[in-house]
Amino acid sequence: MPVEKLKLTIVVLFLFLLNLMMFGCSTSQLTKYELGLESYNNGRYRSAVEYFTRAIWEDPVNAELYFLRGNAKAKLKLNDEAILNYTTAIKLDPEMKYYENRGLTFIETEDYLNAISDFNEALLFDSTSSTLYFNRGYTQALSGNYESAIKDYSRAISHDSTNAKVFVNRGDLWSGVEEHQKAIFDFTSALSLNKRDELAYFNRAKEFAKIGKFKQAIDDYSLAIILNPTNVEYYFLRGELKVGAAEFLSAAADYTKIISLQPDNGNAYYNRGICYANINLKDSACDDLNRAGELGFFEAYEVIRKFCMKEEKKKKK
């Protein structure tokens, strides 16, 4: 199943939790700890690394300091170094959040097997964590283990049914195994939680189209467009459905919008030309088809030969 949907939806909860407990620290270490936290919270991750490193020099067996330095390094995309810090924290004092964040960082390095292993370990601390099941499900999907991913998303929902993203991700997977009604149910559930979920409208529209419910599909594309009026793909897909319903003028309006967003889109000119041809606007149709050809959409020339040049020959006769 293509995982490209997951790119639009997949939304890992990459939260690097900061433990504000400061027991067991000397006064000087506490200051470095606090300065590290302040730097981290203000987005100064390199400074945070420096402060946490100084704190570690004074207390090299404090697991929390390695965890925090790992968080800062992960923010800097120093993923291998972050993983080493989380690993040290785990060796010193295994905690759920250490495994969780190392698992999330393994995802960043595309080491999905180790990520899943870390989420398994984290779940031993809390088997009711919806977030952990979500993250493991996401990783399973990236690994191509779709059945396991669906099970994990279902577990996540059983522990917390208020997260629209989980429904969207599970709906994507149902779609991939052609369980279209289940996919529609999940996207509808997501929209009941978040009526501004553009991706849920978009995905549900595609599912409606697959089962022949074209009006519902057009309606959902329209709602997605309201939320994101510059997404060219939405107009293309809605336009295609309108053409299928012989709503050529309305479809032409969608292609006109695409052209306003992407003036060099040869496909949009071609499609609009076909729409114009179907409503007997021959001059406009041929102008668009010629423009499509100029922009590299070479299929247009065959239509020009059969439609536009044929009309010219008739006029000459």
Map each language-model feature to its residues.
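Alpha-helical tetratricopeptide repeat
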Residues: 2-6, 13-15, 19, 23-317
